[in-house]
Amino acid sequence: MEENKQKALSAALSQIERQFGKGSVMRMGDSTVSRDIEAISTGSLGLDIALGIGGLPKGRIVEIYGPESSGKTTLTLQVIAECQKMGGTAAFIDAEHALDPSYAQKLGVKVDELLVSQPDTGEQALEITDMLVRSAAVDVVIIDSVAALTPKAEIEGEMGDSHVGLQARLMSQALRKLTANIKRSNTLVIFINQIRMKIGVMFGSPETTTGGNALKFYASVRLDIRRIGSIKKGEEILGSETRVKVVKNKVAPPFKMTEFDILYNEGISRESEIINLGVQLNLIEKSGAWYSYKQEKIGQGKENVRLYLKENPQVAAELEQQIRTELLEKKLSVLASASEDLFETIDD
C-alpha cells in the first residue's frame, strides 16, 4: 500500500513539474530548498536585531505605519540607502508627491540611481509596482503611501460622490496579484501607511490603518513607528526619539520593540544605538558621566561619545560587529541548527 502511494505521489509530482515547471513543488528537506531568508538592513542596529533576521526580509511584503511625522519615510529612505550600499536597485512610488530628494541625499541615498514614479491613480501605482517586481531587477520597492492610492473612479468622479470600499477592493485585488510575483523575484515591497480613528469604539484601540484589511494579512512584517520625544540642545530641537514595535513577524518571533534617535538632516543615529546597546552588553563601561571602551575613556556625556564614534568610524564598526555577533548571529546559528535537526527528523 505504501509503495503504491509513493508511486502515485511521484507520478503526480512529475506531472506537476511538466505542467508548471521545475520547482513548482519541493520537499522541505531538499538541500536545494533555501531555508535562509535574505534581509536588507533598516539602517537601525536595534531594529535589525528586533526583526530577528538582521533586517527586512526579501521576497516579502512589509507594512510600516504610524502617525504623521513619526519617521515612516525616513526609515524607508534608510532602507533604500542600505540596499544601494549592497549594490542593489531601489524604486520609490511617490503617490503622495512629497519626496524630498535633498533630504534623501542627506540620509545616504544615491538619488541619481533611485527610480522614482509619481503616479496619477492608485491603479497606475500598483501596476507600476507589479511591472517593477516582475522584472526581477529591482531589490526594494517603496509605496508612499497606501492612503494616497486613490482609485481612478474617485479621481474622475465629482467631489461629493460616495466611493465606499473602492480603495480596499483595489488593494485586495492588487495584493492577490503581487504576492506570488514578489516571492518569485525576491523583491522587498514596503507599503507606508497612515493611521485613522474608528468612530464609536468603546473597548480596545480606536486606531486603524487605511486601505482595508488585505494588507494586514499579506504583510509578513508590520512595524508600528511612533515619535516618543524630542532631542534638545538647550532650546533647539535636534531630532526626535522614536519607538518601533514589530507588531507582526512571520520570519522570526514578533512583538519585539526598539528605540532609536532620528536626527534632522542626518537620519537614524547609528552611534547613539551603538552606545546604548554597548552599555547594555557591557562592551562600553559607564561610570557616572564617563564612558570607557577597552579601559580607555572615550568621552564624558553621551553626546561627546557620539561625536567620538563619528570621528572614529573603525571603533564604531568594531563595536557594531560585536553587538551584532552577540545579539543576532548567535541567535541565528541556534535557530539554524534547531531547524536542521527538525528537517533531519522529518526526513527520517
Curated annotation (Swiss-Prot):
CDD domains for this protein: RecA
Keywords, ordered alphabetically: ATP-binding, Cytoplasm, DNA damage, DNA recombination, DNA repair, DNA-binding, Nucleotide-binding, SOS response
Q: Does the keyword Chaperone apply?
A: no
Q: Which GO terms describe its biological process?
A: DNA recombination; DNA repair; SOS response
Is Methyltransferase tagged as a keyword?
A: no
Q: List the InterPro entries hit by this protein, alphabetically.
A: AAA+_ATPase, DNA_recomb/repair_RecA, DNA_recomb/repair_RecA_CS, P-loop_NTPase, RecA-like_C, RecA-like_N, RecA_ATP-bd, RecA_C_sf
One of this protein's Pfam families, by short name? RecA_C
Where can this protein be found? Cytoplasm
UniProt lists the family membership as follows: Belongs to the RecA family.
The role this protein plays is:
Can catalyze the hydrolysis of ATP in the presence of single-stranded DNA, the ATP-dependent uptake of single-stranded DNA by duplex DNA, and the ATP-dependent hybridization of homologous single-stranded DNAs. It interacts with LexA causing its activation and leading to its autocatalytic cleavage.
Q: What is this protein called?
A: Protein RecA
Instruction: Point out the gene that encodes the protein.
Output: recA
